[in-house]
């Protein structure tokens, strides 16, 4: 957590809020709770005693499709106007059957669905007006150049 933000940025101070997360790559703050996309799950962090550090790491949505391959991360974290969360999984060379996918997690964390597939090593997501999603992907076997895609549900982008 950072404090001391002013026009000069001369007195910034950092404080660790959480440690030990499994390769976190995305973050959202919703209703003063921090949500983190990790390699194995979407975690909601709770500061139970208000001391500025997370005391409880809630498994908000466990990922059932985890690979040990070094590119197999869950990237970014976006939220739509209905409270649903989205992250994107890398896919090329992973040991999973799912070929790199945008995952939609319901607002209560109980339902995970595949939005779209075909991403090698995505390195960013965005959400536009009307809940339109974008994903940038790195080049690779499926794609000869890096690109940004405006997503539609059910489409393969590789």
Functional labels for PLM-detected ranges:
Residues 1-158:
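Beta-propeller domains with acidic blade repeats across secreted/periplasmic ectodomains
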């Amino acid at each position: 957590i950072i404090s001391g933000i002013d026009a000069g940025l001369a007195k910034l101070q950092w404080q660790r809020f959480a440690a030990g997360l499994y390769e976190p790559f995305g973050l959202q703050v919703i209703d003063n709770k921090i949500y983190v996309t990790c390699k194995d799950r979407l975690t909601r962090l709770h500061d139970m005693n208000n001391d500025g550090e997370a005391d409880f790491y809630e498994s908000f949505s466990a990922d059932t499709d985890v690979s040990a391959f070094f590119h197999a991360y869950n990237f970014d974290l976006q939220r739509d106007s209905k409270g649903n969360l989205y992250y994107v999984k890398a896919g090329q060379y992973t040991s999973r059957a799912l070929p790199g996918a945008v995952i939609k997690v319901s607002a209560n964390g109980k339902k995970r669905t595949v939005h779209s597939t075909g991403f090698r090593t995505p390195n960013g997501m965005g959400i536009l007006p009307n809940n339109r999603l974008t994903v940038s992907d790195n080049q690779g076997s499926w794609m000869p150049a890096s690109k940004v895609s405006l997503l539609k549900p059910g489409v393969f982008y590789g």
